[in-house]
A protein has these predicted regions:
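Generic preference for flexible, low-structure residues
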Residues: 13, 33, 65, 92, ...
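Surface-exposed patches in mature extracellular/periplasmic domains of secreted proteins
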Residues: 51-54, 86-93, 142-144, 157-158
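A short beta-alpha structural unit
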Residues: 56-66, 98, 128, 163-165
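Short, solvent-exposed coil/turn linker segments
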Residues: 2, 53, 89-92, 154, ...
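Short helix-loop capping/hinge segments that flank enzyme active sites or metal/cofactor-binding pockets
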Residues: 4-21, 70-139
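Gly/Ser-rich, acidic/histidine-flanked active-site/gating loops
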Residues: 1-86
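Proteins with a high burden of low-complexity, intrinsically disordered sequence enriched in S/T/G/P/A and R
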Residues: 1, 17, 40-44, 50-51, ...
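Glycine-rich, small-residue loops and helix-cap segments
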Residues: 31, 41-44, 114-190
């Protein structure tokens, strides 16, 4: 299939694209340089670039984390049950890790596993409330409101920076990612 044959070279002419400068990867000069080149390419194709901001940015974080704990347990339990792995659930994995802590957890614990294990099913009111709040803040009051308020056709943001080195002493050196709002909102991020 030749997808390029179907592309319209004038598709971006006149499109208003919101640039989310505060919601992507922070302090990554190579990423910023690549992003600037991409913005120049969009302008060269006729797009109008507009600085944009999602007013609710970060307000969904607590609700999103609550969702993560519920969904992690639910998803991992389903995966392990079907995988043929020697452990069949998150609860079994936690117990395995405890029994082999010197080998499985020499540098860190399993606090997130244990917090996820303490959550109930995806039908719990707390889960549904967190899901609804996160989606409302990220989608209706976030992405959708930003698009409407500024009459934008799309938003653009760097999705992620380069992988960071593994640091078993100080932990991850995560520098941010622009895909989070789209993931929480349930909207495409391409």
């Amino acid at each position: 299939v030749d997808y390029l044959a179907e592309l319209d070279p004038d598709a971006l002419r006149g499109a208003r694209i919101g640039v989310l400068r505060k919601h992507g990867v922070s302090a990554q000069p190579d990423v910023e340089a690549a992003f600037d080149r991409a913005l120049e390419a969009l302008k060269a194709l006729g797009a109008e670039l507009v600085d944009a901001d999602i007013a609710t940015a970060g307000q969904w974080n607590d609700a999103e984390f609550e969702m993560l704990l519920y969904e992690f347990r639910h998803g991992l339990d389903a995966y392990l049950a079907a995988s043929g792995a020697p452990v069949r659930s998150l609860a079994e994995l936690i117990e395995y890790n405890k029994a082999h802590a010197d080998r499985e957890m020499p540098l860190f614990g399993q606090e997130l596993f244990e917090r996820a294990q303490a959550k109930g099913p995806l039908t719990d009111r707390a889960y549904r409330d967190a899901r609804d709040k996160a989606r409302r803040l990220a989608k209706a009051e976030g992405i959708d409101a930003t698009l409407a308020r500024q009459r934008l056709d799309a938003l653009v943001v760097p999705t992620a920076g380069p992988a960071w080195p593994i640091d078993p002493v100080n932990g991850d050196h995560f520098t941010g990612a622009g895909y989070g709002v789209a993931a929480v909102a349930g909207t495409p991020s391409i």
